Amino acid sequence: MKVIVLLLVLAVMQPVIQSQPFPGTEELPMTRRPPKGELEYWCTYAKSCDFCWNCRHGICKNKVFEKHPLIKKNDYIQICRVSRYNNRCSYFTDSRIRRFHIMSCTNPTYYDWFDELMQVKEDRVIDVENIKHTCLCMIATIALIGYVRKQYSRMRMQAATRLLIFLGLYVLLGILMTNIIMNLPLSTDNPMQMRRPPERDLKFWCTYAKHCDFCWTCKDGMCKNKVFSDHPIITQNDYIVNCTVSRWHDRCMYEAHFRIHYQHNMNCSQPKDLEWFIELKRHVINQDDL
């Protein structure tokens, strides 16, 4: 009985297996435009590559799979280059961080490189911010310790006692400086540019900089607002952009890192809501017309 069931399953699966796309057998030099007859193959396993999409007025339609829903043009669609040598197929993505995937042409595997690409970009941004904060902490701490050491050198103490006090103050000041700089509330007057504002300040920033990426949690192309639970879920596109926020006394500023640099200044105590995305797109359109 089990053998009969297995044969029936194989009989049903055979048309599906036979319908799987396979590329040509000849070598394919590195190219941005694979042969039209191979599009079904490449767009099955490298579906985010630009040669799989026709885009017009910001709306993109899949060239191969007609039932695929229309999507908005965003950084999910990347410029790709594909090649084939013997039985090895590979595709490369041209982005800030180059990614590539090599697979067997006759036994390909789907690789969701976009999710990994976004994670790598996010980790790299966080690492850079942490390095900046660490360097600032070290400079400030060394300056303070130098002053404290100079003062204690004038006091009559045993060398061991003086050393212990010096090391204790060094550790204490280092911890305090790190906590202060990494968790600046809105009430402080210290300037600091942050990729991720403190969680307690999210409501403020996401009210006046609602398009910034730190206000959204995105998964599988759908984004949910972190602060306002009644906000409808939206699709992930270039409406959501990378932002950094900073403040100086009562001046709050957020910067949008889009195709051009854009920033908005406002009073922290009397903030002004600005639809900066519309203004940003207007600048981009004007630049494209030049």
Swiss-Prot record:
GO terms for cellular component: membrane. B repeats lie at residues 161-290. The keyword Membrane applies. InterPro entries: ASFV_fam_110 (IPR004848). Keywords: Early protein, Membrane, Repeat, Signal, Transmembrane, Transmembrane helix. Pfam families: v110 (PF01639). It is found in: Membrane. A repeats lie at residues 1-160. Residues 1-19 form the signal peptide. Its main location: membrane. It is a multi-pass membrane protein. The chain crosses the membrane at residues 128-148, 163-183. Belongs to the asfivirus MGF 110 family. This is Protein MGF 110-9L. It comes from African swine fever virus (isolate Portugal/Lis 57/1957) (ASFV).
